[in-house]
Amino acid sequence: YFVEDDYIHELDAFTEMLFTYERIASLIGDELILCPTDYPYLYVQTENTNVYLGEKYHWRKINETLCTFLTSKQVIEKHWNKFLSMCTFEHYPFESPLHEIYKQELCISPIPSIAIHCTNINSIYGLSPNKNWKKIWDENKV
Protein backbone atom coordinates (compact mmCIF):
# COMPACT_ATOMS: atom_id res chain seq x y z
CA TYR A 1 0.00 0.00 0.00
CA PHE A 2 1.47 3.31 -1.10
CA VAL A 3 0.01 6.17 0.93
CA GLU A 4 0.79 9.87 0.97
CA ASP A 5 1.03 11.60 4.34
CA ASP A 6 -2.06 13.79 3.90
CA TYR A 7 -4.82 11.15 3.73
CA ILE A 8 -7.34 10.22 6.39
CA HIS A 9 -9.01 6.82 6.12
CA GLU A 10 -12.26 5.49 7.45
CA LEU A 11 -11.71 3.04 10.28
CA ASP A 12 -12.63 0.03 8.11
CA ALA A 13 -10.90 1.26 4.92
CA PHE A 14 -8.14 -1.36 4.95
CA THR A 15 -10.56 -4.22 5.56
CA GLU A 16 -12.70 -2.96 2.69
CA MET A 17 -9.69 -2.72 0.39
CA LEU A 18 -8.34 -6.18 1.21
CA PHE A 19 -11.67 -7.99 0.87
CA THR A 20 -12.45 -6.05 -2.31
CA TYR A 21 -9.04 -6.84 -3.76
CA GLU A 22 -9.55 -10.56 -3.16
CA ARG A 23 -13.08 -10.53 -4.54
CA ILE A 24 -12.35 -8.61 -7.72
CA ALA A 25 -8.98 -10.27 -8.41
CA SER A 26 -10.81 -13.62 -8.26
CA LEU A 27 -13.57 -12.29 -10.50
CA ILE A 28 -11.24 -11.00 -13.22
CA GLY A 29 -8.53 -13.64 -12.75
CA ASP A 30 -5.82 -11.00 -12.51
CA GLU A 31 -4.14 -8.50 -10.22
CA LEU A 32 -5.46 -4.94 -9.94
CA ILE A 33 -4.98 -1.55 -8.31
CA LEU A 34 -7.27 0.05 -5.71
CA CYS A 35 -7.36 3.75 -4.89
CA PRO A 36 -9.25 4.51 -1.65
CA THR A 37 -10.34 8.00 -2.74
CA ASP A 38 -13.22 8.98 -5.00
CA TYR A 39 -11.66 12.14 -6.43
CA PRO A 40 -14.22 14.75 -7.57
CA TYR A 41 -11.98 15.89 -10.44
CA LEU A 42 -12.51 12.51 -12.13
CA TYR A 43 -16.16 13.46 -12.73
CA VAL A 44 -15.31 16.51 -14.86
CA GLN A 45 -15.31 14.45 -18.04
CA THR A 46 -18.04 12.04 -19.02
CA GLU A 47 -16.75 8.58 -19.76
CA ASN A 48 -17.98 5.04 -19.64
CA THR A 49 -16.92 2.96 -16.66
CA ASN A 50 -17.46 -0.42 -15.05
CA VAL A 51 -18.87 -0.83 -11.56
CA TYR A 52 -17.80 -3.68 -9.26
CA LEU A 53 -19.20 -4.87 -5.95
CA GLY A 54 -16.65 -4.77 -3.16
CA GLU A 55 -17.08 -5.88 0.44
CA LYS A 56 -19.47 -3.06 1.45
CA TYR A 57 -18.99 -0.49 -1.32
CA HIS A 58 -19.38 -0.24 -5.04
CA TRP A 59 -16.14 0.47 -6.89
CA ARG A 60 -15.75 2.05 -10.31
CA LYS A 61 -13.05 1.79 -12.94
CA ILE A 62 -10.86 4.89 -13.10
CA ASN A 63 -7.94 5.92 -15.28
CA GLU A 64 -6.11 8.32 -12.94
CA THR A 65 -5.02 8.51 -9.31
CA LEU A 66 -2.58 10.43 -7.22
CA CYS A 67 0.10 8.40 -5.36
CA THR A 68 -2.09 6.58 -2.83
CA PHE A 69 -3.08 3.10 -3.97
CA LEU A 70 -3.00 -0.60 -3.11
CA THR A 71 -1.64 -3.19 -5.50
CA SER A 72 0.27 -6.45 -5.59
CA LYS A 73 3.95 -7.29 -5.81
CA GLN A 74 3.25 -8.74 -9.25
CA VAL A 75 1.94 -5.41 -10.59
CA ILE A 76 4.92 -3.55 -9.10
CA GLU A 77 7.40 -5.98 -10.64
CA LYS A 78 5.63 -5.95 -14.01
CA HIS A 79 5.72 -2.14 -14.21
CA TRP A 80 8.88 -1.53 -12.18
CA ASN A 81 10.49 0.76 -14.74
CA LYS A 82 7.42 3.03 -14.82
CA PHE A 83 7.37 3.22 -11.02
CA LEU A 84 11.10 3.91 -10.95
CA SER A 85 10.73 6.66 -13.56
CA MET A 86 8.61 8.61 -11.07
CA CYS A 87 11.77 9.01 -8.98
CA THR A 88 14.26 9.57 -11.75
CA PHE A 89 12.48 11.81 -14.29
CA GLU A 90 10.33 14.92 -14.11
CA HIS A 91 6.80 14.06 -15.23
CA TYR A 92 3.86 16.38 -15.68
CA PRO A 93 1.65 15.51 -14.10
CA PHE A 94 3.84 13.68 -11.62
CA GLU A 95 1.49 10.67 -11.67
CA SER A 96 1.51 10.22 -15.46
CA PRO A 97 3.49 6.92 -15.26
CA LEU A 98 0.68 5.57 -13.07
CA HIS A 99 -1.88 6.64 -15.66
CA GLU A 100 0.08 4.68 -18.28
CA ILE A 101 -0.05 1.59 -16.03
CA TYR A 102 -3.83 1.98 -15.70
CA LYS A 103 -4.15 1.57 -19.45
CA GLN A 104 -2.96 -2.01 -18.91
CA GLU A 105 -4.19 -2.83 -15.40
CA LEU A 106 -7.62 -2.42 -13.82
CA CYS A 107 -7.69 0.47 -11.36
CA ILE A 108 -10.79 1.11 -9.24
CA SER A 109 -11.97 3.53 -6.56
CA PRO A 110 -14.89 3.27 -4.11
CA ILE A 111 -18.23 5.04 -4.34
CA PRO A 112 -18.34 6.88 -1.99
CA SER A 113 -14.76 7.42 -0.89
CA ILE A 114 -13.18 5.55 2.04
CA ALA A 115 -10.30 8.01 2.38
CA ILE A 116 -9.90 11.74 1.97
CA HIS A 117 -6.99 13.63 0.51
CA CYS A 118 -6.46 16.57 2.86
CA THR A 119 -5.69 19.10 0.21
CA ASN A 120 -6.82 22.66 -0.24
CA ILE A 121 -10.60 22.51 -0.72
CA ASN A 122 -10.23 24.94 -3.64
CA SER A 123 -7.74 22.74 -5.49
CA ILE A 124 -8.70 20.73 -8.55
CA TYR A 125 -8.86 17.60 -6.36
CA GLY A 126 -11.47 18.93 -3.95
CA LEU A 127 -13.06 16.89 -1.18
CA SER A 128 -14.63 13.56 -2.00
CA PRO A 129 -18.42 13.95 -1.99
CA ASN A 130 -21.17 12.23 0.00
CA LYS A 131 -19.22 11.80 3.24
CA ASN A 132 -19.20 13.49 6.63
CA TRP A 133 -15.46 14.13 6.71
CA LYS A 134 -15.65 16.04 10.00
CA LYS A 135 -17.01 12.88 11.65
CA ILE A 136 -14.24 10.76 10.13
CA TRP A 137 -11.65 13.35 11.21
CA ASP A 138 -12.97 13.15 14.78
CA GLU A 139 -12.96 9.33 14.73
CA ASN A 140 -9.28 9.37 13.74
CA LYS A 141 -8.12 11.58 16.61
CA VAL A 142 -5.18 10.11 18.49
Enumerate the language-model features and the residues they cover:
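C-terminal catalytic/acceptor-binding lobe
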Residues: 73-74, 78-142
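Conserved catalytic core of nucleotide-sugar-dependent glycosyltransferases
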Residues: 1, 8-82
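A broadly tuned preference for mixed-charge, low-complexity surface segments
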Residues: 4, 54-61, 118-128
